[in-house]
Each structure stands twice: as C-alpha cells, then as structure tokens.
C-alpha cells in the first residue's frame, strides 16, 4: 500500500476521522488548527482555525454539515464544514479531551479533563435546531454531567453506543464504564486493562467496540454485557485501534512514548500500524512509515482505506490494495466452498 502523505500540521496529530460517506478526512493537532482533506487524493479542502491551544478531539455529524472540536483552551466549538466558520463556541471549566455528536445529531458528548481542581467529567449538551435542521444554539445548561465514579480514575475517552442508548467511557486506571445516554445514570464498570485506556472506537453497528491501552493490549468488548470478546496483544504501548468494515480485521496504532523517541530508531520504537485478524486474533501485517508514535488510526466507513495521525505531524492515508481484500485463512476459504455447494444443492 503506497500512502498519500498529508502535511498540514506543524505539531503532533491528536485525532483523525472520516465523515460518514468516507470521502473526507478530518484531523486535529497540537498546533491549534484542524484540517479537512479529500480522502480520494489527499487534496486539502480547508482549515478550521479559531482555537488558541491544542485541539484534542474532532468529530463530524452524519450529514457532514457541522464539525465539532474541543481543546486545551477550555472550550469546544461547532463549525460549518462548507465555510470553515466557527458558528458556536462554548466555554468549559477544564480542557476538553474528547468530543462527539450523538448518533441522531441531537446532543453533544464532551469529556472534561481532571485539572484545575476539576475531578473530570462527561458533560452532555442538547442542540437547538431550526425547522431546516440548522444548529441555532447549544443549550446553556447541560442535560447532565457524569462525574468520575468513586472506584475509578479520570475519564480519557468516551463514545455513544447504538442509538445513543449508552455512553461508554475509558478510564486512566484501565476500567471501562457505561451510563445511560438518556440521563447519565451509571450502568456498570469493569477493569479490562492494566494501564490507561487511550481510545475507544465502535463497530459500524455500534454493538461492540475496541479499546486500546498503554498496557500494549487492545480488547474487543460487547456493549451490553461488557464481555471481552477478543484480545489483541502488541509489542508496544497502544494509542488507538479501529475496526474495519468489509474485512474481519482490526488496525492498531501506537509506539514507544514520545518523550523517548529521540533516542530510538523507528524499528525499535515500533512506529507501525498493525493489522490483526478480528476473529483469530493473529497479527497478519504491519504498515511502516511514521517516524514517531501513531497517535490515532481511523478506518473509512467504506472499508477501502485508513488514515493514521502521528507524533511526527503527518497524516498517512492508505488505500487498501487487492491483496488486502484477497487475504483469507484456509478455514475461511473452506467455509466459502461449502456454502457455495449447499446453495447449489438447494437450487
């Protein structure tokens, strides 16, 4: 896979995302700017420039009309994608670590950091829209605030489950916790990692999700039961993991801590994206290129490409080639042959 290298940031990338159609890539960075790119050729579409500090997180709504960013400058902003203008800005009590639109686009999920005397929390706001579906305002008072549960440390990441039924959070001590999306009521918590959880990404139907942790393990977890379905063990701390549509794979990204990078070669630092089989849990390939840790990996909803954002300030956009789609285990090939024979008998 020959990548398209996107250079639009002066500092490390913090998050990379595709829109629902998979034709645009959204990225944010520690240089206080977010960028938008065409996924097909890597051409730069524009920038979102109004923050005064690190942008930790970015999201885009289902219709690619609005983008949402949150950062270290104690605020989150809503942008018109077509114009690149920030139409709403809301101040927060502490830096914003993660932002996300709810699946139906009616609410915002905001994760606040545990600094400045704030214990860390997840805040949910409702959006006020007009009859044309345009966002008129963000409700002044949040719908509810989920403070860090007593038996856990601060929340690093959070995301909505299917239909916005649950909010799933990943904690600094390796726990995951669930809350009802309607009112923020606590549902359950479970410790599945030994170190902090850096990322949570959902399957296309949002019924299960993958966590990535600094303990070098990624876990596939059922939303309703918190049963750990699969585990993927890497040889380096992980920052991000994503589930691929079309093929039964997961992609993991990470590497040695950024503070140790200057004394380490790229090979020793493990600065590669790793592709694992989702069912059999085997590593089936690696993609090199970054010369620093991978801070985020995201797979296109179309399943035809993935993007990685690195500590080196580059976004590497990979379009999967034929060998990726042709790869099958012997058991998969056998199953397909048997299934074809059964269908022929039925005819």
Swiss-Prot record:
GO MF terms listed in the record are: RNA binding; translation initiation factor activity
* Residues of the signal peptide: none
* Stored SUPFAM superfamilies: WD40 repeat-like
The subcellular localization recorded is: Cytoplasm
**Which BP terms from GO are recorded?**
formation of cytoplasmic translation initiation complex
Q: Which Gene Ontology cellular-component terms appear in the entry?
A: eukaryotic 43S preinitiation complex; eukaryotic 48S preinitiation complex; eukaryotic translation initiation factor 3 complex, eIF3m
- What family does the entry list? Belongs to the eIF-3 subunit I family.
Report the protein name in the record: Eukaryotic translation initiation factor 3 subunit I
| Species this protein is from | Kluyveromyces lactis (strain ATCC 8585 / CBS 2359 / DSM 70799 / NBRC 1267 / NRRL Y-1140 / WM37)
